């Protein structure tokens, strides 16, 4: 039986451990995120609005990064410049903006930007619609994708520890009740 070098095993284990943007959240991450989203003073919609200072939002999510909660939003400017905007989940101010220049982050940003190609509505509107259709739930993330020539937004929602996903068509205009 051939021996597999420890470095190869470590690399494989690390690659399986890393979670790309938009990947399914495991149960531990859900348990960690639910109270963060519930306690956040800034909603996903507010973060999306704030991030527009740095381009068009193409995805957003609450996450735990290095043990600390944050609201991360990917934006695109001038059609080809991608940024990660970190919005402080307590104050609503932009904490940091970094260009996305390579790797999986850039590939994901391009895919999400493609998902907005036929959109006639903003992601923020999709989040509002998903929350309206699911009273009492808070939005955890929103990701755009293109499917069957429609721009779709997948909105992940949580209420206590109950998780739901809503898929909203961004190519269909739907007037929303003002909140």
Task: Please report, for each region that a protein language model flagged, where it lies by residue.
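Long, terminal "pre-/pro-" and other extracytoplasmic accessory regions
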Residues: 2-8, 13-179
